[in-house]
């Protein structure tokens, strides 16, 4: 196990003995920021370098958030279904073709004329329940009562306009796989030979737009402290010879991390981001449900799931306030 300490955090553990240097530096960067102050930071043993953060990162939410910690694949999850019976090997090629036909992959989404909208009303009901639970937790944590949120088609229309995504893309991306490391897999148990269907996907382009919208806001919500401006004035006013000013300003900027500083969301900006996170994470869950519905239709009426495990691994849990980067 590796233990790390930083400027703001003295309690970080990585549950493995050897980690790549770049991953260590990414973790140290977070420990040197106020966002990690006073909480336990725990890094899973399969950790490796991600985009701006390590995979396997877990930390309680503090009074600020960084949308880039979770990134664009909000709500990325794995669902595994244990099938009630095995699938004959002779069916594999036909089934593979059927799934590729019924589940858009890569950059592709469904066409509006083929949209199966069975999921929309249950989605609204679920996301509203999740938001209600989140608002209760927000009040318990911060003592702030927020106005009621009712997600419906009109709300989604405003949200899509805000983050810059077409409404048709929002609705037609449900039931689509995406690319990267997302997959649909048929597995076999080495114990009893049972077959398992596994789906790995997230919130698609909607999640990307949510992340990018809030990440851009970070640059507007935090300003340099007054001490920086006072020192800046002193340097430009009192430094002699004046040829030394550029070097002194460079040292000042380095000390305050100007140009490299991690800007965080706080207060209302943090609240708005977490609301959108709840919406996107629930969206990812229904994306899985829609794909499963299509695949079981391809399998035929004789196939059902006798057990199901759904696990989200890239999310912010807004009920127990945990950040999980997977």
Say what each PLM segment does.
Residues 2-29, 36-43, 49-59, 63-67, ...:
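Domain-length cofactor-binding catalytic modules of enzymes
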């Amino acid at each position: 196990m590796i233990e790390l300490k930083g400027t703001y955090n003295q309690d970080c553990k990585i549950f493995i003995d050897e980690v790549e240097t770049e991953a260590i530096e990414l973790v140290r960067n977070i420990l040197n920021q106020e966002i990690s102050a006073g909480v336990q930071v725990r890094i899973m043993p399969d950790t490796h370098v991600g985009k701006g953060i390590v995979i396997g990162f877990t930390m309680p939410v503090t009074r600020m958030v960084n949308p880039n910690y979770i990134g664009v694949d909000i709500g990325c999850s794995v669902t595994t279904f244990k099938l009630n019976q095995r699938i004959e090997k002779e069916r594999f090629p036909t089934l593979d073709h059927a799934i590729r036909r019924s589940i858009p992959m890569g950059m592709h989404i469904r066409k509006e004329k083929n949209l199966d909208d069975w999921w929309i009303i249950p989605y609204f009901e679920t996301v509203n329940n999740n938001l209600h639970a989140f608002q209760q937790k927000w009040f318990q944590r911060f003592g702030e009562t927020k106005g009621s949120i009712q997600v419906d088609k009109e709300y989604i229309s405003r949200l899509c306009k805000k983050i810059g995504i077409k409404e048709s893309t929002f609705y037609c991306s449900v039931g689509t796989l995406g690319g990267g490391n997302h997959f649909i897999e048929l597995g076999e148990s080495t114990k009893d030979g049972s077959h398992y269907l596994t789906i790995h996907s997230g919130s698609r382009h909607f999640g990307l737009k949510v992340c990018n919208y809030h990440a851009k806001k970070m640059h507007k919500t935090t300003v340099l402290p007054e001490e920086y401006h006072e020192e800046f004035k002193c340097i430009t006013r009192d430094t002699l010879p004046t040829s030394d000013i550029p070097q002194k300003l460079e040292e000042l900027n380095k000390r305050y991390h100007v140009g490299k500083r991690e800007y965080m969301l706080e207060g209302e900006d943090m609240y708005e981001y977490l609301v959108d996170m709840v919406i996107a994470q629930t969206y990812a869950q229904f994306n899985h449900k829609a794909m499963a519905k299509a695949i079981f239709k391809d399998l035929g009426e004789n196939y059902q799931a006798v057990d199901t495990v759904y696990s989200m691994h890239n999310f912010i849990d807004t009920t127990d306030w945990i950040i999980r980067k997977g």
